[in-house]
């Protein structure tokens, strides 16, 4: 080949009809003419603004809020049990010249312990509400949560002992004990037995809520 002849250009043919493949020279122009895509908009978060702050603390904050609600719920039965026991005194209309038949809660040491324990637990639940509110705001405070856990366990143990002792006396008042020749007194003192029985039920309900509080605190500390 001489230097004056134009160089031959080879075009590859891949199909069976002898046609050259189409060139893609118009593709960049079409891409340039296409409008720019709009920037992606992040989805707006929906929910309570207080619980949206600090997503990494959301679970602990929800547990702390549930702890606060349960403390309010436990305060009612504990206070009701203390008031019902303290006002359970009953005096029969039948009496003699020298003796008057009556039933008083302070005649039974178990009921006296029961009343004091429920009053202490009710007062503790009220005093613990500000600390529980602090944990809702600052869920990362482990020391305060550990303090409430220990106090909740102490209150639950004390109230369980008091409610169990009172339940034994209530059962004795309803059924008596034939072997010991102790007669049931609920046949005569209806109001006394109704109030003390309701107090025991309310107190055990408080114990159940306190156990839930202990479990919640343990789960929160374990997450940390």
UniProtKB/Swiss-Prot annotation:
Keywords: Cell membrane, Cell wall biogenesis/degradation, Membrane, Transmembrane, Transmembrane helix. Residues 1-62, 132-145, 222-224 are cytoplasmic. GO terms for cellular component: Casparian strip; plasma membrane. Signal peptide: none annotated. Residues 1-22 are annotated as: Disordered. It is found in: Cell membrane. One of its GO terms (biological process) is cell wall modification. It is a multi-pass membrane protein. Its main location: membrane. The chain crosses the membrane at residues 63-83, 111-131, 146-166, 201-221. Residues 84-110, 167-200 are extracellular. Homodimer and heterodimers. Regulates membrane-cell wall junctions and localized cell wall deposition. Required for establishment of the Casparian strip membrane domain (CSD) and the subsequent formation of Casparian strips, a cell wall modification of the root endodermis that determines an apoplastic barrier between the intraorganismal apoplasm and the extraorganismal apoplasm and prevents lateral diffusion. Belongs to the Casparian strip membrane proteins (CASP) family. NCBIfam families: A_tha_TIGR01569. This is Casparian strip membrane protein 1. The lineage of its organism: Eukaryota, Viridiplantae, Streptophyta, Embryophyta, Tracheophyta.
């Amino acid at each position: 080949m001489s230097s004056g002849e134009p160089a031959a250009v080879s075009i590859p043919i891949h199909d069976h009809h002898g046609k050259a493949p189409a060139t893609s020279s118009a593709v960049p122009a079409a891409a340039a003419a296409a409008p720019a895509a709009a920037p992606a908009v992040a989805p707006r978060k929906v929910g309570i603004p207080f619980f949206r702050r600090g997503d990494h603390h959301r679970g602990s904050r929800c547990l702390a809020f549930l702890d606060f609600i349960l403390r309010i719920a436990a305060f009612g039965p504990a206070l009701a049990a203390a008031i019902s026991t303290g006002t359970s005194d009953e005096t029969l209309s039948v009496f003699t010249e020298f003796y008057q038949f009556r039933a008083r809660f302070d005649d039974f040491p178990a009921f006296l312990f029961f009343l004091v324990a429920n009053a202490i637990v009710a007062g503790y639940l009220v005093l613990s509400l500000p600390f529980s509110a602090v944990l809702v705001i600052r869920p990362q405070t482990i020391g305060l949560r550990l303090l409430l856990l220990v106090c909740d366990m102490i209150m639950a143990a004390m109230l369980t002992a008091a409610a169990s002792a009172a339940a034994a006396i209530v059962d004795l008042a309803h059924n008596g004990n034939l072997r010991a020749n102790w007669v049931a007194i609920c046949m005569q003192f209806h109001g006394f037995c109704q109030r003390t029985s309701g107090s025991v039920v309310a107190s055990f309900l408080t114990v159940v809520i306190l156990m839930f509080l202990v479990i919640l605190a343990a789960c929160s500390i374990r997450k940390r």
